Amino acid sequence: MKQSSFSYKKTLGIQSLMVIIPHEDDEINTAGAAIYSAVKEGIHVKCVFMTNGDWVYPAFVRFDETLRALRLLGVEKENVIFLGFPDGGNRGERSVYLHGLDKPVDAGGRTETYGCGDIVDYHYEKYGQHQKYTWNGLLADLKDVILSNRPDALMVTDFDYHVDHRMLSIAFEKVMGSILNEPGNTYEPLVFKGFAYATSYVSYKDYYERHFLSSRVYRKEMRYLDCETDNPVYEWNKRIRFPVASACRGPGLLHNVLYKALICHMSQKNIEHVRQVFNGDLIFWLRRTDNLIYKGKVTVSSGVSSYLHDFQMMNAKQIADTRPAMEDYLWMPDDKGKWCRCDFEKPQHIEAMALYGNIEGTGRILKGKFTFNNGFSIDVGPLAKQGHETLISFPPQDGITWVRFDIGETEGDGAGLSEWEILPSKYVCHPFIQICVDGHFAYDWHVYPGEAPAISCYSAEKIGELRWLLDGQEISLQELNSQIKNIKQKSVVRVELKDNPEVWCEAFIAPADIIYRMTSSVKRVIDQLGVWWEHQMEKTPHHKLKRIKTISDYRKIIQ
């Protein structure tokens, strides 16, 4: 049963989606619920794997596990692409970013991309030869696979603490920056970046809590502990939260399609993480590709101007370090009259701008001023700390042929900008809303004795006035929250936009009476026992995987 107006096709306005991930199994940790729902909506979904995941287990094991998992989510083999680069290892021992700058990496005797059986690597399938294990080779193939398919949206693993995750995040942003800065480029996909670890694979073991909870950051698994996520630029309250289909929620893990897909990756012992991966929302951070700066010419008073428009808000070289230092990402002018300017060949419509500064706290812009060719100007500052977004909104400006930013007052030696966004609109997606209880996405929520749940509404953007209904009767949010505390029977809570009722969401709220508490406890125990039993049944074949040498050996184990 549909519980909201949200859909990937209509809300995001897309017909195709590409998910780019570092290893086989990260497709589920990063975007499993999105893959499943997008396929169900008829969106053409492709999954691209950067490495063969061949650090411990043979590539043919990882490939087969992935194809079986994705088949459960609706993605067939022809829509799965393996770039064929080596797993970088636990400390980047075979990373093409760390060791493939001057010559190909030697990964167990291999120096080129490869496939197994009837699966060939991307470069060989397209060009008839394998790609060298080099950083430039990875960038070339990643750019090629994106431009060959030109998906409407991309979902990409971000800067988790694993070396390969960090490498993919950096590689993708370099490639995307290259694409967007090409003269005459018209390709501006939606880009969503999300984590596979601290909000998913190694997050809280909370699946069997009273309520189905939304994603949270497990700070013990973070490396940038003074930041809100492992990408220091991101702010938690600016994440995009997508609702999750019922098949990806339960009831129980044994009936959860994502659970069934995740445990296909037996080599990774993923069954030990199933209580952590699945949440009531799927979270990403939106990266704007409609930035008008890519259509202009940037000049600066001093410093490296390309850092202002390279699509990289951060960059690190020593990605095997626990907490890599940020390098080569910041426009940092060193003259007295510090300024940057963007000139456009054609007049532009501008509604907002965003500035991103120094991540590491060694300097910050305190005061600055934007000036437009039409005489409009606006003072800004101080910029947000830790490189966070400073969003500047103003009345829409038309006919703009140039914009200039003059830096006034600064502090520290490292004051500068990592990125400058000039935005033609404040938002890029159609509005959607989701009912929340105590901040968690609510679908079927039971109120336990002594609880005082607070109902609210999430939206990814600023929205108009809301209309709340309880069992079809209009009600104020204050009165709704008052009644929910003492709810006596299962009720339907609905919220919709007053000026656009086609944007709506519903949730079922019911009392957790003694019968419900008893039956749900029994079901929970049965489900946990089922998962435990599957775990026991998996142990022996998992140990055998470590000793296999051939595909036929593998087939005998999984039969």
What is the role of each PLM region?
Residues M1-I20, E41-H44, F60-R71, V75, ...:
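Metal-dependent de-N-acetylase/amidase catalytic core
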Residues D321-F432:
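Aromatic, loop-rich ligand-recognition surfaces of beta-strand-rich domains
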Residues F441-E451:
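Short, solvent-exposed loop/linker segments at the N-terminal edge
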Residues E451-S459:
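A short beta-strand segment in extracellular, disulfide-stabilized domains
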Residues G472-S482:
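Surface-exposed, flexible coil segments in extracellular/virion-facing regions
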Residues L480-K490:
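Solvent-exposed segments in extracellular or luminal domains encompassing
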Residues P501-I514:
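Edge beta-strands of extracellular beta-sandwich domains
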